[in-house]
Amino acid sequence: EQATLIDFGKLNADIVPDKNGGMTQ
């Protein structure tokens, strides 16, 4: 289930980098 969060986080980072503190990968 954690893998989904990581994958989702990466996708979200592209859309909302603010959540990651401005970290776009």
Curated annotation (Swiss-Prot):
Cellular component, GO annotation: periplasmic flagellum
DNA-binding found in the keyword field: no
Keyword entries, A-Z: Bacterial flagellum, Periplasm
Domain of life: Bacteria
Keyword Iron-sulfur: no
Annotated compartments: Periplasmic flagellum; Periplasm
Function: Component of the outer layer of the flagella.
Subunit structure: The flagellum consists of an outer layer composed of repeating units of FlaA around a core that contains several antigenically related polypeptides.
Record-given protein name: Flagellar filament outer layer protein
Organism of origin: Treponema phagedenis
Gene: flaA
